[in-house]
From Swiss-Prot:
InterPro entries according to UniProt: DjlA_DnaK_co-chaperone, DnaJ_domain, J_dom_sf
J domain residues: 113-170
SUPFAM superfamilies assigned: Chaperone J-domain
Polar residues: compositionally biased ranges: 57-77
Region (Disordered): 56-83
Name of this protein: Uncharacterized 19.0 kDa protein in cobS 5'region
PANTHER family associated with the record: CO-CHAPERONE PROTEIN DJLA
Length: 171
């Protein structure tokens, strides 16, 4: 059994026919029967947007008549001068002689352990992390320690700590 639509005003309702009768029914079926040409054209136009309401792009009745983005370049000095700064945040930042201290990121438990494994503090730079990693790898490498198991474990811990810090974006 195959479904055949009942009609335009009966969405979700179907006749059940065998395949041959469905083909015959569909030959004579016209979704737009009874509609004028203008109604068919309107339906086809609305079908483009899935019969949802749309608005003309770029039209906003509430927008001020200022320059558009295409008329001003955001990177130009003029655009920065025209920028509204009602709370004075930008002017205060310009007035400061130096940059503010970067906010310290709160370390996760594993990140703190990784820094501890490398013998570093949370404020270590990328260069500090890499230098500590290289020194500890050389110191605890199995070839440098004659196969000492304790040193091998430390070697693995150093590698894991460095990889974790690398994945976390510290180096």
């Amino acid at each position: 059994m195959h479904r055949a639509p009942v009609g335009r005003n009966a969405e979700g309702q179907y006749f059940m026919f065998c395949f041959e009768h469905v083909k015959e029914y569909n030959k004579g079926y016209n979704f737009f029967s009874g509609l004028s040409d203008s109604e068919v054209a309107r339906y086809q136009k609305e079908a483009i947007t899935g019969h949802r309401p749309t608005w003309t792009v770029g039209v906003n009745k509430n927008a001020k008549n200022g320059p558009t983005q295409s008329q001003t370049r955001s990177g130009s000095a003029g655009a920065q001068a025209r920028m509204r700064d009602p709370f004075g945040f930008v002017s205060e930042a310009r007035a400061r002689s130096g940059r503010p201290e970067p906010r310290q990121r709160k370390l996760k438990t594993l990140e703190a352990k990784a820094f501890e494994t490398l013998g570093l503090g949370a404020s270590a730079t990328t260069a500090d992390i890499k230098a500590a990693y290289k020194d500890l790898v050389k110191k605890h490498h199995p070839d440098a320690n004659g196969g000492d198991r304790g040193s091998e474990e430390r070697f693995r811990a150093v590698i894991q700590a460095y990889q974790l810090l690398k994945q976390a974006g510290f180096c």
